[in-house]
């Protein structure tokens, strides 16, 4: 229910009506009674209707004539207040649609009266509008009268009324046509749609039209009549009308209700018959008028164009063409031709402006333009309307730049401002605004001094006109400067945008349809097959038609567009404008490309290319015929010939870059403007977005880009992207900050351009690749014989293109890489470098790309990708090879796991590096190899392992870089470790391969040839490895030899157990002995010249400063390694059959090395000797885990951590298991003891030969005499114990003699003065040298063996004693080495070594050695004293005889410790030996020993050597105690057994004791020491012993007692004499002191007396002779006389002497007690 018919609304309406009628009644009460009555009856009428009817509104409408009557009467009063009240009430009724047709007629008549009386004009208009808009009851004459009323009010004198009336008319006209449209809608389903009117239809009768349509028809017909200044048929009563208003009304109807004219033939007829002729007639003044033409030539004055009419006509024309083009084809052709004419230069500027605005309206409607093309341009004899429009715009734009000739009246009042469209000849800086010292350009076009500003007139894509909308203007407006140019510019842009988007949209739809059809057609069913064929055929027909239209449109417009756009591009000073022009050119080029229009495509591309480059830039590719035809083409526009203006490039543009042109001959610099850069970006955009349609024009595009990139100084970076180069590279390149910020963007777009090549089809891609290759060839030609930097653009872009097309790389790989390989061989290094960069980058990318199927399943593709890498090996340029190797390295790092069949190729690249190709190449290749060995051995086929070994070995032999050689050896170790760990797998795979090869060989009838055949393939692999290491072991460089040697032996040691048993024969004879022979030969022939330190900063140690010394090291290492293998692998070698021969060869090598004059070699030979002697019984250690033998010197650090070197190997090769491989499951046990013994005796003979040869003193001595070193001799002697263990069963006296000679000779060898500080201990250290220790050890081993050995061995004891005693003698008499003169170390008491420069050789300090030997003698004698051989061979006598020497020397011994040790040893030996001697007294075997012993005592106790001056008192006392010990021994061990001892000997002993008791004084001592230095204790001991044995009642012979008595008598007599003399001299001297000697003597005598008395008292009384007592007592008076002496010392001694006499003061008890015997 609508808002006006709801119960509430109706109720309110009734209330309002009643109140209106009451108000009317009240107003008319006095003056107009009839009206009052009518109003009151009206109230009753309304109430009645409301009461009686349910449908109140319908009842009201039925009775509306009566209901409105009171109000009409009220209006008739002409009273303003009443009239207003009534009109408001009537409007209310109308708005509720309760007015019938009759009532409406009455109302209109009443309104007409009010109009004629000029009353309430605005209210009238409002009422009419309400009446006509709220219902459709008003028709025919009533409607026409209402419309006329409005027109009449439009022409009053009141402006407000006029304007309101104009608006009302417009609304009413619209309402009339809206009614018609609504009527048509209602009858649409009933009546068929009328056929569209044909152009030649006759006029139809109006009677066929329905009511609303008839009203509309009559109205439109009269509007045409009125505009044509004719009388109207229907709008009767019109008094006045303007043409402008009429045209506006016509335009609005045509614009708003086009369907009315298209659907009704009657209306269509009106269009053709009335509207079009009217428009053409009204255009007449505009067509004929020529600005500036002389009027006199024409017979009648030409009517001037009138702006308001002209502008409205153009609006109408725009609507006619836009809405009714299909109806008015011929008429539209006329209109369009007229429009084009209005653009002529001789037309007023305002006319040109509105005309160009009108054309702009069409340019934004591409479908309309398409219709023009189809209707005119494509018809054979028709005007080429579309082409003419485009050309006219171009001519119009060109004309604006042509300054009019002088004398031509520029303006006319009627025509408006002539300069409006544009040209202003301006000063040079016109359009520039100074800002802060800089200059900012206003947007403008500037060409040859003509400056035209660019105005912002509309949004792109919409034609919002300015002057076509000036409906209020009567006079022509003043057109702003540049307006017409701006609109024309927009026309071009919108035209291009519209056409291109339309065609591309349709193309897209067509392609989609084709695709859909194809997809559906791919599985047609039988029933629809025919149907599909039909639709496909229709599709093709449609496409042919569409394509013909598109091509015609482009062909019609491209020349004009290009001419205009090129001119504008050249003239543009505004970035935005330039951008728009370029965008238009780009879209046209792309469209032409899509349609396959090559000429036009290339023309647009050429234009962009030329815009990108500096003016007149010499680029041949752009100066083709295509471009030439363009520059001179003229277009005929309306009979005028307009030449294309060629670009002048004089426009003021900011220069942003200055650079060098890319040419063979250097030219001056060229300048790039910001516009050039903008064009470049467009070119990039074109190529990026439309690469698929460029085809052959890629050549144009890329050539231009290459030149721009060159001028801007962009250089390729990784991946082919271009980045700004360094300033250094182009000193003539100057870039402003403006362009610097652009460069990264340009670079980015360039990259994206080539990235987008991945979306090109294969053919387009080949076009691109071919274009790049030919560009590259040009660049290569330019770079020949030219030092100038080459252009790398093409190469960089080939790379980028390849990278993004990896998914289909196969189709372009060969041409791409083939060309890049050519580039790699170019003489220009920069060019080459980039060729290699591109090639390697492509290979790497190809291998990492995720192909489908993957490379692992597509070996052909993998090898195709890798092949160029191999081809690079044929190029000799080192920089290319370096790139190649770096590429290999990166391939390994990224793809190493999946190379598979590509391995031989990759390894071949590494191995192809020759020694002469420079250090960096070798280093890079080697890095690759390192990576292979560390990471990829498990992933490669086992057949490639030998190649790896060969390549690694070849790097070892390269002599450019030592570290590489050393590290390659480390790699060989790693490889061997890998073989070891993966042995089973490798062996299986190799055997399988071998079987296959064997089969092939048999089929071909050839012999399978491989190294070390017929060893198994896995063993051959090992042997190849050993052979490689063997080669390296004799390399000229010492470090390489050393490392290779260590590795070889470590490898054999660690992994040798994997070899088949038979293969060991090859290892020993072909690898090891062959190597030893070569090393020995090289060592013996090596140069002895000193090698200077290399490079000044590498110091060569003196031990390595000759080639000979360096080879010595190798010899050492090799020999040690071989010996180690013989030791550890003997269980494998011994069963081979010729082991004893191999043993002899090894011993021979050891002997020759040991006898080498090089200390290092000789010493090492002995160490090797030791090694082979420490062999344990085979197989005993099979349960122990084994670690590989490590050679003394670790593998060089350069190699880094070598896997496996320090890792213990799990004993998978436990000897038991391994031997199972060789024979039976039981390991062989060596049972042939005899053979073993022969091996050891061969070793003994070798040892003896080495020992005797090396220790034999030379006959003559000079500076170069070779004397073996101490370490050598030590090692030699140290070998004996180990060797002896094997030969002891057969070791006899002769062998002992041989041994003794060698020991004696070895110990006698002096040492070099250089080495002495390191070997000689100082005298304070009683340290033995290693050699001395070794000698004693050897003897110790022997004596221990003799001790436990059989009886026949024990006869060797004396020989051992002789050897030891000979060594003891060295303590006082060092041995002589031949005739060699040696310096001895200084006297022991100074406790230091003094080495004198002239002496070359220094004798050792033999004292500690001799002393240790003595200790050994004593110990051994303790064990063997009673042994028969020891007794028979007079060993004890020999010992005493040997000891006599140091004992007699005593203080003169080189070392004080010697004589002390000699004494203690003598005492120990005698304590053991004397009982044995007494035991054998009768045999006479010891007779000669006693005199020797007596002489020894004599020499020691009464030595001729004097104590040193610095001997301390305490030391003297200690020495005296030693003397006392000797006397005690005599007392305890000799004298008690005098019966068993020769008498001569006893007599000698007694004489000695006697002598000791008297002559014990020392000759040199101070007064202070006198009481100590007199050897009192010794004297006492001698006395006591003498007395003990003198008075012993055991004395058996008178002779013995006589000796004693005589000794006492002499002693006492001498004492008496000394005392008497002293007393006498004391008395005579008076106060003068006596001489010192005499005082000393008297003191000594007094002490001797006291000692004697003490001794006598202690002795048994029966042993003392009475006569002796008498002599003692007789001394007493003399002693008393001495009391008067003045010397305190004498007094003190006298006191001590007198005290003992107290015992004699007692009266004797009886004579018997004291009596004689």
Swiss-Prot record:
The modification Phosphoserine is found at residues 205, 537. Its main location: membrane. It is found in: Early endosome membrane. It holds the Pfam family DCB. Keywords: Acetylation, Endosome, Membrane, Phosphoprotein, Protein transport, Transport. GO terms for cellular component: cytosol; early endosome membrane; extracellular exosome. Residues 522-538 have a biased composition (Polar residues). The modification N-acetylserine is found at residue 2. Residues 511-538 are annotated as: Disordered. GO terms for biological process: Golgi to endosome transport; protein transport. Homooligomer. Heterotrimer with ATP9A and DOP1B; this interaction is retromer-independent. Interacts with SNX3. Plays a role in regulating membrane trafficking of cargo proteins. Together with ATP9A and DOP1B, regulates SNX3 retromer-mediated endosomal sorting of WLS away from lysosomal degradation. Belongs to the MON2 family. This is Protein MON2 homolog. It comes from Homo sapiens (Human).
């Amino acid at each position: 229910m609508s808002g006006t018919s709801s119960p509430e609304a109706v109720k309110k309406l009734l209330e309002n009506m009643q109140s209106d009628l009451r108000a009317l009644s009240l107003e008319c009460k006095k003056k107009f009674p009839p009206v009052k009555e009518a109003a009151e009856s009206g109230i009753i009428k309304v109430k009645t209707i409301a009461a009686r009817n349910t449908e109140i509104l319908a009842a009201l409408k039925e009775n509306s004539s009566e209901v409105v009557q009171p109000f009409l009467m009220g209006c008739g009063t002409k009273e303003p207040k009443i009239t207003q009240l009534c009109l408001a009430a009537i409007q209310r009724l109308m708005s509720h649609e309760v007015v019938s047709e009759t009532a409406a007629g009455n109302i209109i008549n009443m309104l007409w009266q009010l109009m004629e009386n000029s009353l309430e004009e605005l209210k009238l208009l409002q009422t009419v509008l309400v009446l006509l808009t709220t219902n459709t009851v008003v028709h025919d004459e009533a409607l026409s009268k209402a419309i006329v009323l409005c027109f009449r009010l439009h022409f009053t004198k009141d402006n407000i009324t006029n304007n309101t009336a104009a608006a009302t008319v417009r609304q009413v006209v619209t309402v009339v046509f809206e009614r018609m449209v609504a009527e048509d809608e209602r009858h649409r389903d009933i009546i068929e749609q009328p056929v569209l009117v044909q152009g030649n239809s006759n006029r139809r009768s109006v009677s066929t039209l329905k009511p609303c349509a008839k009203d509309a028809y009559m109205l439109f017909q009269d509007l045409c009549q009125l505009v044509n200044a004719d009388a109207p048929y229907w709008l009767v009563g019109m008094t006045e009308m303007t043409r402008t208003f009429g045209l506006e009304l016509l335009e609005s109807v045509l614009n708003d209700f086009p369907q009315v004219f298209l659907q009704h033939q009657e209306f269509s007829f009106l269009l053709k018959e009335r509207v079009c002729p009217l428009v053409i007639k009204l255009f007449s003044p505009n067509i004929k008028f020529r600005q500036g033409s002389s009027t006199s030539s024409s017979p009648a004055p030409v009517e001037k164009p009138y702006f308001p009419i002209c502008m409205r006509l153009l609006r109408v024309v725009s609507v006619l063409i836009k809405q009714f083009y299909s109806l008015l084809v011929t008429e539209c052709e006329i209109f369009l031709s007229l429009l084009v004419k209005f653009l002529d230069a001789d037309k007023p500027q305002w006319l040109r402006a509105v005309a160009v605005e009108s054309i702009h309206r069409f340019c934004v409607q591409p479908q309309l333009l398409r219709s023009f093309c189809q209707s005119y341009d494509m018809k054979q004899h028709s005007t080429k309307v579309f082409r003419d429009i485009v050309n006219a715009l171009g001519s119009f734009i060109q004309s604006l730049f042509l300054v009019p000739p002088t004398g031509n009246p520029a303006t006319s009042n009627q025509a408006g401002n002539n300069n409006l469209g544009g040209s202003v000849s301006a000063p040079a800086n016109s359009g520039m605004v100074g800002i802060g010292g800089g200059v900012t350009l206003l947007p403008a076009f500037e060409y040859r001094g003509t400056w035209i500003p660019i105005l912002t007139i509309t949004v792109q894509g919409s034609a919002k006109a300015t002057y076509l909308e000036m409906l209020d203007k009567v006079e022509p407006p003043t057109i702003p400067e540049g307006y017409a140019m701006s609109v024309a510019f927009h026309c071009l842009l919108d035209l291009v945008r519209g056409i291109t988007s339309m065609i591309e949209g349709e193309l897209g739809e067509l392609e989609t349809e084709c695709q859909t059809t194809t997809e559906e057609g791919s599985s047609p069913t039988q029933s629809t097959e025919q149907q599909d064929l039909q639709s496909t055929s229709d599709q093709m027909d449609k496409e042919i038609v569409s394509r013909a239209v598109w091509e015609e449109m482009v062909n019609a417009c491209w020349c004009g567009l290009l001419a205009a756009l090129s001119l504008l591009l050249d003239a543009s000073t505004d970035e935005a404008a330039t951008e728009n022009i370029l965008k238009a050119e780009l879209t046209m080029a792309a469209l032409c490309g899509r349609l396959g229009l090559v000429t036009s495509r290339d023309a647009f591309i050429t234009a962009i290319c030329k815009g990108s480059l500096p003016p007149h830039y010499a680029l041949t590719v752009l100066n083709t015929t295509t471009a030439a035809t363009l520059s001179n083409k003229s277009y005929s526009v309306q009979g005028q010939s307009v030449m294309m203006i060629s670009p002048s490039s004089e426009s003021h543009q900011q220069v942003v870059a200055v650079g060098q042109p890319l040419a063979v001959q250097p030219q001056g610099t060229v300048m790039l403007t910001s516009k050039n850069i903008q064009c470049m970006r467009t070119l990039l955009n074109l190529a990026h977005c439309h690469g698929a349609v460029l085809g052959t024009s890629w050549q144009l595009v890329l050539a231009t880009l290459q030149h721009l990139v060159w001028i801007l100084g962009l250089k390729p970076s990784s991946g082919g992207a271009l980045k700004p180069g360094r300033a250094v590279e182009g000193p003539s390149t100057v870039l402003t900050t403006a362009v610097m910020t652009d460069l990264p963007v340009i670079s980015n777009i360039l990259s994206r351009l080539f990235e987008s090549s991945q979306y090109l089809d294969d053919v387009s891609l080949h076009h691109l690749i071919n274009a790049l290759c030919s560009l590259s060839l040009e660049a290569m030609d330019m770079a020949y014989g030219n030092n100038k930097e080459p252009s790398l653009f093409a190469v960089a872009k080939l790379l980028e293109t390849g990278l993004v097309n990896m998914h289909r790389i196969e189709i372009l790989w060969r041409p791409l890489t083939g060309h890049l390989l050519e580039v790699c061989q170019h003489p220009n290094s920069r060019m080459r470098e980039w060729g290699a960069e591109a090639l390697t980058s492509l290979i790497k990318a190809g291998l990492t790309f995720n192909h489908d199927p993957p490379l692992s399943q597509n070996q052909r593709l993998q090898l195709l990708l890798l092949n160029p890498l191999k081809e690079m090996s044929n190029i000799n340029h080192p920089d290319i090879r370096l790139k190649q190797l770096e590429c290999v390295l990166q391939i390994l790092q990224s793809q190493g796991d999946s190379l598979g069949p590509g391995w031989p190729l990759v390894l071949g690249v590494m191995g192809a590096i020759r020694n002469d190709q420079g250090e960096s190449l070798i280093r890079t290749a080697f890095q690759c190899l390192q990576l292979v060995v560390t990471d990829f051995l498990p992933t490669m086929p086992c057949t490639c392992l030998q190649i790896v070994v060969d390549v690694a070995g070849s790097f070892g032999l390269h002599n450019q870089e030592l570290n590489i050689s050393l590290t390659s050896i480390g790699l060989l170790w790693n490889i061997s470790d890998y073989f070891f760990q993966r042995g089973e797998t490798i062996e299986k795979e190799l055997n399988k391969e071998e079987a296959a090869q064997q089969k092939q060989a048999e089929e071909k009838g050839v012999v399978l040839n491989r190294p070390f055949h017929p060893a198994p393939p896995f063993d051959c692999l090992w042997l190849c490895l050993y052979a490689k290491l063997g080669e390296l072991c004799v390399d000229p460089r010492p470090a390489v030899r050393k490392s290779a040697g260590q590795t070889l032996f470590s490898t054999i040691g660690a992994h040798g157990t994997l070899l088949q048993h038979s293969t060991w024969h090859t290892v020993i004879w072909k690898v090891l002995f062959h190597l030893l022979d070569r090393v020995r030969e090289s060592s013996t022939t090596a140069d002895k010249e000193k090698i200077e330190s290399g490079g000044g900063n590498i110091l060569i140690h003196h031990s390595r400063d000759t080639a000979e010394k360096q080879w010595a090291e190798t010899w050492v290492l090799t020999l040690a390694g071989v010996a180690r293998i013989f030791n550890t692998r003997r269980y494998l070698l011994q069963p081979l059959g010729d082991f004893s021969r191999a043993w002899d060869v090894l011993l021979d090598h050891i002997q020759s090395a040991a006898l080498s004059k090089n200390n290092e070699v000789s010493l090492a030979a002995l160490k090797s000797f030791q090694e082979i002697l420490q062999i344990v019984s085979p197989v005993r250690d099979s349960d122990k885990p084994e670690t590989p033998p490590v050679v003394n010197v670790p593998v060089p650090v350069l190699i880094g951590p070598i896997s496996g070197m320090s890792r213990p190997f799990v004993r998978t090769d436990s000897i038991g298991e391994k031997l199972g491989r060789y024979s039976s499951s039981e390991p062989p046990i060596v049972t042939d003891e005899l053979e073993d013994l022969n091996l050891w005796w061969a070793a003994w003979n070798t040892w003896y030969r080495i020992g005797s040869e090396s220790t034999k003193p030379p006959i003559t001595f000079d500076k170069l005499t070779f004397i073996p070193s101490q370490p050598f001799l030590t090692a030699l002697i140290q070998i004996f114990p180990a060797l002896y263990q094997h030969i002891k069963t057969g070791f006899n006296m002769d062998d002992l003699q041989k041994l003794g000679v060698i020991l004696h000779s070895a110990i006698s060898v002096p040492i070099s003065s250089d080495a002495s500080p390191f070997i000689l201990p100082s005298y304070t250290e009683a340290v033995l040298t290693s050699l001395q220790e070794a000698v004693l050890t050897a003897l110790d081993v022997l004596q221990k063996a003799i001790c436990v050995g059989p009886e026949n061995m024990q006869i060797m004891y004396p020989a051992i004693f002789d050897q030891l005693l000979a060594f003891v003698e060295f303590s006082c008499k060092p041995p002589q080495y031949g005739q060699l003169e040696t310096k001895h170390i200084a006297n022991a008491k100074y406790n230091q070594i003094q080495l004198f420069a002239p002496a070359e050789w220094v004798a050792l300090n033999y004292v500690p050695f001799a002393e240790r030997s003595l200790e050994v003698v004593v110990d051994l004698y303790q064990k063997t004293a009673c042994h028969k051989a020891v007794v028979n061979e007079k060993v004890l006598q020999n010992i005493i005889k040997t000891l006599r020497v140091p004992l007699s020397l005593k203080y003169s011994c080189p070392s004080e410790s010697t004589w002390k040790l000699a004494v203690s040893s003598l005492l120990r030996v005698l304590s053991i030996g004397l009982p044995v001697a007494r035991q054998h007294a009768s045999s006479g075997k010891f007779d000669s020993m006693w005199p020797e012993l007596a002489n020894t005592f004599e020499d020691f106790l009464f030595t001729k050597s004097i104590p040193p001056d610095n001997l301390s008192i305490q030391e003297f006392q200690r020495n005296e105690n030693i003397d006392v010990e000797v006397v005690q021994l005599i007392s305890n061990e000799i004298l008690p057994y005098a019966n068993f001892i020769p008498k001569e000997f006893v007599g000698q002993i007694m004489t000695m004791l006697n002598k000791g008791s008297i002559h014990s004084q020392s000759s040199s001592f101070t007064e202070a020491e006198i009481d100590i230095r007199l050897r009192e204790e010794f004297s006492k001991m001698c006395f006591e012993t003498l007395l003990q044995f003198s008075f012993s009642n055991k004395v058996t012979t008178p002779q013995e007692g006589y000796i004693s008595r005589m000794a006492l008598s002499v002693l006492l007599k001498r004492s008496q004499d000394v005392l008497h003399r002293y007393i006498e001299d004391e008395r005579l001297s008076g106060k003068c002191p006596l001489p010192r000697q005499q005082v000393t003597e008297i003191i000594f005598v007094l002490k001797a007396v006291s000692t004697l008395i003490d001794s006598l008292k202690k002795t048994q009384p029966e042993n003392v002779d009475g006569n002796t007592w008498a002599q003692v007592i007789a001394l007493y008076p003399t002693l008393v006389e001495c009391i008067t002496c003045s010397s305190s010392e004498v007094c003190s001694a006298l006191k001590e002497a007198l005290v003992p006499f107290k015992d004699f003061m007692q009266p004797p008890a009886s004579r018997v007690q004291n009596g004689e015997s």
